[in-house]
Swiss-Prot record:
Binds to muscular nicotinic acetylcholine receptor (nAChR) and inhibits acetylcholine from binding to the receptor, thereby potently impairing neuromuscular transmission. Pseudo-irreversibly inhibits the nAChR through competitive antagonism. In contrast to other long-chain alpha-neurotoxins, lacks affinity for neuronal alpha-7 nicotinic acetylcholine receptor. GO terms for cellular component: extracellular region. This is Alpha-elapitoxin-Aa2a. It comes from Acanthophis antarcticus. InterPro entries: Snake_toxin-like_sf. Expressed by the venom gland.
Length: 35
């Protein structure tokens, strides 16, 4: 699942990261929550 960094929906996060609950940004914590 593609999740997005910041509020720019054109910038996907690195491969392997999952979509976060807000669907507006992602990071390591977001990845853990998505798994």
């Amino acid at each position: 699942v593609i999740c997005y960094r910041g509020y720019n929906y054109a910038q996907p996060c690195p491969p392997g990261e999952n979509v976060c609950f807000t669907k507006t940004w992602c990071d390591a914590r977001c990845y853990q929550l998505g798994k």
